[in-house]
Amino acid sequence: MFKEIKNITKNYAIAEINGDINSDILNINVVIEDNDLRILGEVEDIDNGLVKIAFLGEFHEGKFYSGIIRRPSLKSNIRIINTDELKELVGENDDKSMLLGLSPLYNNYPVKINIDKMFSNHLAIFGNTGSGKTWGVSRLIQNLFNLNGKIAFNSNIFIFNNTDEYHNAFSSINKYNSNFNYKMYSTSRSDNKEGLDLKIPLWLLDVDDYANLLDITDYFQINIIEKMLCYVSAFAKNDQDAIKYKNHLIAKAIISVLYSNQVSAKIRDQIFNILKDCYTDELNLDVQVPGVGYTREFRKCFDIDNTGEFVERILVTAYIQSFIDNNTKWSEEYTPTYFTLDQLEVALNFTLISEGLLLNEKSYGEAIALKVKLHTLNNSSNKKFFEVNQFMTLDQYISSLILFDSSRRAQIINFVFDEIDDRLAKSLVKIFSRMVLRFSKMQAVRGSIPIHIMLEEAHRYVQNDRDSELLGYNIFERIAKEGRKFGVILDLITQRPTELSSNVLSQCSNFLIFKLNHPADLEYVEKMVPNISKDVIEKQKALQAGTCVAFGLMMKIPMVVKMQIPNPPPTSSNASIYDKWIIEWNNK
């Protein structure tokens, strides 16, 4: 079949072949033997009786090692790999391996992957719409739950998607084993939806979470959020200390305005604006201010006489100053405690008056933007996602997500962000990702509870946005760089890799690339994916639906892999226009 080698370069050998050989050997692996040297190659091109063979690595004592040190001589022999060598390349059939798919080049020979090498590293899955990407993901997870003699009982796979397309594929995983369970949380407002209502405890969100949730545009707003959280923590108990603190803040804010260099009418308007949003039983517009032998309604104290002065300036000033307590050391630390969006909005209002932010032209825009966004959230249908009935810690919350019932756990938790806008969905994915990373860092034994964060339509979330500029980091970049140490792994699934953060993509170690057509996507993947070759890029151009090029730490060499049809499949197929539009018609 193969004749003598005509030429050897750094990475290739050019050899003659018999004239009756056709293109069936294209992409087939061969072994080039030169005494004790056995080099693995792949037939990349056939032209006029010559084949171009790319060097991939070497076999030593039956084991394959990527890369070569020595080149073969021109006298070397070339043959197609044998069964033992093929087994070495497609993975070992042992307890730590699982089925990935089948090799169409080798008569559907099973391709096995090491579970650790696959699931301990970040994964990227690319492919056009209709390339079989979602079906491939479904089959990959189904294979994990269909091992022989062992079960993935302690697996934790958090799926984030804007549709429930994976529900059909995973809702019946207990058919593999009764210990397997699946949960779905949904943001749908439909009464007929499947899945549980999504609920997120507000006190588990940190400053950066609120920065994303309220879509900040300036670093200055982070300081406002920090102060807001301190106040909501201090006010949450609503005890005498909390009331005294509120009175202290209101009184200081009013006094600062009262003694400002402004006309009386403007001072009155600003004080009334303060008390419109921030008030207590003791300090409000309707409270009776006691004088000597009489009382005066608070708002009436600010009536202006014909000299332009307040009629009860001395009386009201003394009353307000009686609530200022500069001797008490008020807590400036945020302690997670139960609170609601209503209480958070109150805390923000106190933050704005205590810092005088609404009276400062430079800070007014950023301050009022936060106020409007929080008020909008608190008065929208999205408020229900943050309505939790009782306090729980982060550990308890993550456990509640995983817990299936009082005695069983779920292995797959599917978060479906439907009927909400993309901005909120992106914020929620970031919030959950931060929670998962914090939870994993809390564990006494590092990496003891591995969790996969699977992002369908990953380009919606993992972007080159302003988080690095405003917060100093991007949560997905942080997980990509340090998450593996703590068992937090990203799975990025997208048809638009050009929109992914390059810093995150460069940290991925495993890849399943289904068919991609757009030149910009192909160029980006070739540029950003570590160790990808032009040959891999060329291979994926001719892939059938449901077939991918698999490479990375999980594979010995890049291989074309045919993913088996998932059973049951996801609901990701296109609508059947013929069935829905076309009817029988007998026009007589």
Describe the residue ranges of each PLM region.
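The conserved Walker
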Residues: T129, S468, P497
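P-loop NTP-binding catalytic core
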Residues: E61-H122, S572
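P-loop NTPase motor domains
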Residues: D164-S171, K199-I475
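Conserved P-loop NTPase motor module
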Residues: A545-K588
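Conserved ATP-driven motor cores of ASCE-family P-loop NTPases powering translocation/secretion/packaging/pilus
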Residues: L471-G472, E477-K562
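Long, basic/Gly/Ser/Thr-rich N-terminal segments
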Residues: M1-L89
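Glycine-rich phosphate-binding loop of nucleotide-binding enzymes
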Residues: L99-T187, A253, S502, A550, ...
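Loop/turn-to-beta-strand initiation segments
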Residues: N154-F158, R409-I412, S448-H452, F486-D491
